Amino acid sequence: MFCIICSVRYSNPKLMHVGHQYMADNFDPKTFTGLIEFKSFHITPDKGLGIFTFNNQTNMQKHLSDIKSFNKDYEDRFSCKITLDTGIANPDLYYKA
């Protein structure tokens, strides 16, 4: 499994909730071919994390520019910085009940 990891840091923590509502209303992960799951986490009042898991590297690479484009608009709207990384899920340390 291949992942895109988005680390988000808000300059104003009060915008995180508003940003998440915007994302829930305007972002449709079902349009991404090969997307297995998308998870979002609150880490601290001003930090969040999103993880997109794809079935293969080709599908991950295909949607990387779409996610970067959405993130750029999101950064401008909600006064935050998004750092994007890619990685591979370790099947030996991946557990899903």
Model features per residue range: what roles?
Residues 1-49, 55-69, 76, 80-97:
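Short S/T/G/P-rich N-terminal loop/turn motif that feeds into the first structured element of a domain
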